């Protein structure tokens, strides 16, 4: 779950959602993860649209809105994006939860925002190849990793949420999604035409940020 994180000592506004990222006061101060569907998606959520919109004309409007964000973007990178926030290069960052965890470990005064427009979810799965030499061992590992105590330790360590609800009670409370966060979407596959437009939006956006 990507979230907004910012340094309240460096930001003059109270960030509540994605739409606030377009505020002129944030010029050249935002670090973004490098995921074209996610960044298109948060733009759509800021516009009241679905992250999985497939109407190409609507997606083109998303691209226009995204270009308006470019002046506020300091950098775009996927790995260790939190470092830009920690070293002062950026004052606001849009981070994966693992990066949020790393950032808070270094600076607990950072403010984490669960955007009011809703969250975008991605799911990482475990899969067993059809020709796996020891499927029983693989199933045993999956059973182990999903035990509440083990799943909670994984969440505390890396920051990714567990699909085992029973683990929530054992996780660091700061890493549990607040009860009042009720809106969200899973990023899903879209049509080839829609995906092509999302990628076009992304290419044009990155060029505008350079």
What spans do the regions from the language model cover?
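Short secondary-structure boundary segments
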Residues: 8, 34, 97-98, 157-158
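Short, hydrophobic alpha-helical packing/hinge segments within bilobed ligand-binding/sensory domains
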Residues: 18, 81-84, 100, 138, ...
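Mature extracytoplasmic/periplasmic domains
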Residues: 119-120, 124, 129-186
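Conserved C-terminal helix/tail region of periplasmic/extracytoplasmic solute-binding proteins
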Residues: 83, 185-210
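Extracytoplasmic ligand-binding site segments that recognize negatively charged/polar headgroups
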Residues: 1-89
